[in-house]
Amino acid sequence: MRAAVLRSYGDPLAVEEVSDPEPDPDGAVVRVDACGVCRSDWHAWKGHGEWADNRVPTGQVLGHEPAGEVIAVGDRVDRFAVGDPVVVPFSLGDGTCSYCRRGHGNVCADGRALGFGPDAPGAFAERVAVPTADYNLVSRPDWLSARDAAALGCRYMTAYHALAERAGLDGGDWLAVHGCGGVGLSAVQLGSALGATVVAVDVDDGALSRAAAIGADHTVDPGALAGTDDTVPDRLRELRDGGVDVSMDALGIAETCRNSVRSVRPRGTHVQVGLTTDAERGEVSLPTDWMTRWEVSFVGSRGMPPTNYDDLFSLIEASDVDPGALVSRELALSEVSERLAAMGEYDVRGVEVVTEFDR
């Protein structure tokens, strides 16, 4: 089968023939009909993560936002059969550890990350193997196309887990989203659907326009504050006296992280979703005394447990959230490298999805 393989950090992925995957006795193989291209793929492509012992090795097939159809199952799989439409989460649990048993498979003690390690080849490929299929595979509703499910990918589910499950966002809350790429725009849509007043923060006019079109009640451009005495936290406190209830850093650079923390009200919550770059190397200094004084919570959030997808699907079906509305471009497998490079220049708008795997 054709797959896009990381051979050298920062160089074009090698689109080459690799062996077809075979299902484990408790696993499945999925034909990939669509796979999103995510900033986490960019981090992997650049070789980031060395500082956290989390660097993706060369030789890896990247891609972690697939949707498609089951084409083979092992003899110990009970819940899925050939022909079933599915979504494949990138956080793959073993289904048996204490975290998985409590519904936290995204932090499984023996978990795998699809597309980020040799034990889980990714989905920039025609087919992908899924271990422990009964636990990890997610049935895809009839109303959700593979393309739109790939847009859901790790963006909507990451945003949903961060807002609804980690930060406890409620109807009537104020939410600030710092960084309006794929995850950030998903958070804007979902925050609005959950009943929050949403403020989108980004330096790009196009990103802010898109955020306003899909649910942001207010927008803030940090660049427009240059040369003034105002800061992003100041502006957010003007909009919502005392600060917002929940603030998300969806980008990961030091400035957005600190701005997000400083934007919340007393006893508010900052949720960290964006991963750092070479500049931060996993470390950002924070106003810890101020956070202690005002009992500000800082929570990390990674992906979403595979067992929680039905809650997200129910919210999408019951609201006007449209994952497909964020798809800005459909790609061929051979175009992935070019689009990863564009991410380094912050020249990607919305969500880009691979839908052609034969070129």
What positions do the PLM features span?
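C-terminal substrate-binding/catalytic core of Rossmann-like NAD(P)-dependent dehydrogenases/reductases
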Residues: 230-233, 237, 241, 279-329, ...
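Short N-terminal strand-loop motif that marks the start
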Residues: 1-65, 126-128, 358-359
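NAD(P)H dinucleotide-binding glycine-rich loop of Rossmann-like/cofactor-binding domains
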Residues: 94-178
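Short glycine-centered segments of the SAM/dcSAM-binding site in methyltransferase folds
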Residues: 85, 174, 268-269, 297
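Mid-domain Rossmann-like dinucleotide-binding core that forms the NAD(H)/NADP(H) cofactor-binding site
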Residues: 85, 142-225
